[in-house]
Design a protein with these regions (language model features):
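Polyanion-binding surface elements
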Residues: 1-14
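Short, Lys/Arg-rich nucleic-acid/phosphate-binding segment
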Residues: 30-35
């Protein structure tokens, strides 16, 4: 299928498809100057979308797809590889979630302090503009 149909079918823009091609995430066959997207491209784009939902970066996704494609892994090795990738990613996401939770708590405390300040009290938040 052609690039426009592929983009529409997968609910992405043509620019996104081209970006993924430039990064080597999808590898369509080029016939007479036009890209032709096959079932392998369909599978790859579904994998890309799924990994993006899991908050993997495009570079991480490329590493995963490249290793799966070129690594000549048997099923057990493939599972071990992905297990390690997922464990590392889980740890990073848990750390980010903890940091976001702490930041959210601090913002809520500041908001509460601000709201509890007397309304008619002037609060100096910066430089005087006069």
């Amino acid at each position: 299928m052609k690039i426009g149909e592929f983009a529409k079918k997968n609910d992405i823009t043509i620019d996104t498809v081209r970006h993924y091609i430039d990064l080597g995430l999808i590898l369509p066959i080029k016939k007479t100057g036009q890209y032709d997207f096959d079932l392998r491209c369909e599978k790859d784009i579904k994998d890309i979308q799924r990994f993006k939902e899991m908050k993997f970066s495009l570079n991480e996704i490329k590493e995963i797809l490249t290793y799966k494609t070129l690594g000549n892994l048997n099923e057990g090795e493939s599972k071990d590889f992905l297990k390690n990738i997922f464990e590392d990613h889980i740890n990073r996401l848990e750390k980010e979630a903890f940091e976001i939770s702490n930041a959210l708590t601090l913002v809520k405390e500041c908001e509460k302090d601000l709201l509890s300040t007397k309304l008619n009290q002037n609060i100096n938040l910066g430089l005087s503009i006069s």
